[in-house]
């Protein structure tokens, strides 16, 4: 799991809004540090780390919902959608690892007396693997489209605005 970026200079005697904005700013920077891997479907570990960073961003928005108000709620919906898509992608990655593991254990060893049943198991696993890889490509493409849609709609700009606002966010 990716480590959370540290949030420095948070003090208990500071106003809640100031603390919330400081934490939010760090969480936004953490999420957007993953931009270089957004279009790289092979970046499996980094994509999972992005999902965890999105989760931290969402929890920050939820924890300080009284500070960020309706503008924060809109961002929670976007972040949650991205997080869920990446969760589905991670589930597929785990499934693909499992398929490869089973296939490796199911491959007959040389001189081990391969049977027709061994061939059909290997063929079935190969088809399953191919189908799941195709689903992963489709899901990654959907994630990229979703990410791009949210960015074009101003997600980053709106998040940064929330982190810099000196007043309670409005509708």
Residue ranges, per PLM feature:
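Cationic, histidine-enriched alpha-helical/coil surfaces that engage anionic ligands
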Residues: 1-171
């Amino acid at each position: 799991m990716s480590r959370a970026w540290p949030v420095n200079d948070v003090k208990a005697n500071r106003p809640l809004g100031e603390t919330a904005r400081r934490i939010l700013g760090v969480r936004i920077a953490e999420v957007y540090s993953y931009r270089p891997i957004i279009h790289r479907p092979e970046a499996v570990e980094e994509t999972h780390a992005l999902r965890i960073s999105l989760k931290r961003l969402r929890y920050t928005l939820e924890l300080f919902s009284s500070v960020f108000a309706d503008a924060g709620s809109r961002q929670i919906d976007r972040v949650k959608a991205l997080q869920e898509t990446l969760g589905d992608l991670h589930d597929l990655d785990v499934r693909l690892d499992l398929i490869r593991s089973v296939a490796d254990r199911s491959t007959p060893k040389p001189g081990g007396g391969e049977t027709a049943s061994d061939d059909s198991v290997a063929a079935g696993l190969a088809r399953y693997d191919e189908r799941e890889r195709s689903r992963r490509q489709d899901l990654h493409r959907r994630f990229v489209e979703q990410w791009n849609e949210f960015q074009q709609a101003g997600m980053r700009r709106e998040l940064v605005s929330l982190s810099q606002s000196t007043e309670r966010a409005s509708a």
